């Protein structure tokens, strides 16, 4: 799920895309690339933004949610819907050479993203990371 289009500045760190896809929807191009690698997989691409209006309906279709988004508002939204729907939430984030990954709301473990970052307003006020995330994965 991504409402953005491929830009030339993505290419050094987002390996699903090439110059040929610049200007095209990221979600659709990622789906095409992954299906070209393995034709037996099923991918549902959502070339739009996750919102309070569509999140519950989309998340309800899946058993587990894996999140690699780049903003706190979306992380809190995913977290809250996963709690509501009793879905495990796998969270991943990167800034520079530092990364985080965690699993929330799994089995009897009731810890969630808000336990890790309880102050949503404070997180929203944090400055964005500097440009130039290194593509070292």
Where do the protein language model's features map onto the residues?
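Adenine nucleotide-associated cytosolic modules
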Residues: 1-137
């Amino acid at each position: 799920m991504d409402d953005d289009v491929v830009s030339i500045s993505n290419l050094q760190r987002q390996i699903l895309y090439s110059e040929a896809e610049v200007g095209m929807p990221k979600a659709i191009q990622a789906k095409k690339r992954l299906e070209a690698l393995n034709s037996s997989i099923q991918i549902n691409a959502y070339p739009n933004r996750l919102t309070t209006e569509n999140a519950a309906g989309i998340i309800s279709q899946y058993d587990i949610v894996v999140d690699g988004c780049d903003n706190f508002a979306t992380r809190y939204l995913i977290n809250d819907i996963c709690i509501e729907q009793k879905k495990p939430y796998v969270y991943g984030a990167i800034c520079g050479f530092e990364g985080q990954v965690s699993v929330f709301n799994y089995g009897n473990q009731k810890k969630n993203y808000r336990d890790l970052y309880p102050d949503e307003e404070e997180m929203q006020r944090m400055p964005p990371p500097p440009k130039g995330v290194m593509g070292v994965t």
